[in-house]
């Protein structure tokens, strides 16, 4: 157990569970495989379980931390001079500005707090054009939602939006015993890599988001009912989408097809008016 653990009580409001297993830490560093020429950002360095070994391989590491007590402990570490520290909520961080400053894509990693992991990933998708890849420790249940496919209970809006933006892989299963305090859930370490040649295309991702919101608000309803305010049954037939399917049985590509149809339909209506 890290010496600093006794000096800092994990705060529930920040969802803090600190990684302590040395073998797991080594495996994660190996997975990330950092290069000195890259711009790397760690979200939530905590007690520096990943920060310290990363600094041994890098000349500079950017960290974002919201807990002032943890920053105070971090300042006492021998590798602190290698850090560029941002004391703020990662949900407010401007990665676009960092990209313009560094003039290269950004690699982001971290042991994400369970209470903000989903919100943070959605936030990062909005800045995806400046991100090279993301490597995160997540609650296993959240990771399963990210990679889930049609027909599974875990398949939903998060699955569709995540797979639209990224290729996602679970790389490591992590036991609750690897953390302090010990969480009640299992974790996994995952990689999210923005598509180089995306299998999906939409004119407007906000329309895709709106359609999936309507569909999954009533996930047990069939499409012709859950999406009746957006599409007629004739339109669904025209798009070769089975109107008797439930939201959880519709593929990402079909949701993209719906989004593009609605985009064109809306534009045509604007031209008429």
UniProtKB/Swiss-Prot annotation:
Q: Which reaction does it catalyse?
A: adenosine(1518)/adenosine(1519) in 16S rRNA + 4 S-adenosyl-L-methionine = N(6)-dimethyladenosine(1518)/N(6)-dimethyladenosine(1519) in 16S rRNA + 4 S-adenosyl-L-homocysteine + 4 H(+)
The molecular function terms of the Gene Ontology recorded here are: 16S rRNA (adenine(1518)-N(6)/adenine(1519)-N(6))-dimethyltransferase activity; RNA binding
- SUPFAM superfamilies in alphabetical order: S-adenosyl-L-methionine-dependent methyltransferases
Zinc-finger as a keyword? no
User: Record's GO cellular component, any one?
Assistant: cytosol
**What keyword terms does UniProt attach to this protein?**
Cytoplasm, Methyltransferase, RNA-binding, rRNA processing, S-adenosyl-L-methionine, Transferase
Q: Which residues bind S-adenosyl-L-methionine?
A: 17, 19, 44, 65, 111
Question: Which InterPro entries is this protein grouped with?
Answer: KsgA/Erm, rRNA_Ade_diMease-like_C, rRNA_Ade_Mease_Trfase_CS, rRNA_Ade_methylase_Trfase_N, rRNA_adenine_dimethylase, SAM-dependent_MTases_sf
Task: Identify the Pfam families for this entry.
Answer: RrnaAD
Under the heading SMART domains, the entry gives:
rADc
What domain of life does the UniProt record list for this protein's source? Bacteria
The UniProt record lists the keyword rRNA processing: yes
EC number annotated for this UniProt entry: 2.1.1.182
Compartment(s): Cytoplasm
Q: What does this protein do?
A: Specifically dimethylates two adjacent adenosines (A1518 and A1519) in the loop of a conserved hairpin near the 3'-end of 16S rRNA in the 30S particle. May play a critical role in biogenesis of 30S subunits.
Q: Tell me the protein family, please.
A: Belongs to the class I-like SAM-binding methyltransferase superfamily. rRNA adenine N(6)-methyltransferase family. RsmA subfamily.
Q: What is this protein called?
A: Ribosomal RNA small subunit methyltransferase A
Lineage of the organism: Bacteria, Pseudomonadati, Pseudomonadota, Gammaproteobacteria, Enterobacterales
């Amino acid at each position: 157990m890290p010496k600093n653990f006794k000096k800092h009580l994990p705060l529930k409001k920040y969802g803090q569970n600190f990684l302590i297993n040395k073998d797991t830490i080594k495996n994660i560093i190996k997975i990330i495989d950092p290069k000195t020429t890259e711009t790397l950002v760690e979200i939530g360095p905590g007690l520096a379980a990943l920060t310290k070994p990363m600094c041994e391989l890098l000349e500079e590491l950017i960290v974002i931390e919201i807990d002032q007590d943890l920053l105070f402990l971090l300042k006492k570490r021998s590798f602190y001079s290698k850090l560029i520290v941002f004391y703020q909520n990662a949900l407010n961080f401007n990665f676009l500005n960092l990209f313009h400053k560094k003039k290269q894509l950004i690699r982001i990693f971290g042991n994400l707090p369970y209470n903000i992991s989903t919100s943070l990933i959605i936030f990062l998708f909005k800045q995806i054009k400046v991100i090279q890849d993301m490597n995160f420790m997540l609650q296993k249940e959240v990771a399963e939602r990210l990679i889930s496919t049609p027909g599974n209970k875990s398949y939903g809006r998060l699955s569709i939006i995540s797979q639209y933006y990224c290729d996602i892989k679970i790389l490591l299963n992590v036991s609750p015993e690897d953390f302090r305090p010990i969480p009640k859930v299992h974790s996994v370490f995952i990689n999210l890599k923005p598509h180089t040649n995306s299998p999906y295309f939409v004119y407007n991702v906000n329309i895709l988001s709106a359609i999936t919101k309507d569909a999954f608000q009533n996930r047990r309803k069939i499409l012709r009912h859950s999406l009746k305010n957006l599409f007629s049954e004739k339109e669904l037939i025209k798009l070769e989408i089975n109107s008797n399917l439930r939201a959880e049985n519709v593929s990402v590509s079909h949701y993209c097809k719906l989004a593009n149809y609605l985009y064109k339909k809306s534009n045509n209506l604007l031209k008429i008016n």
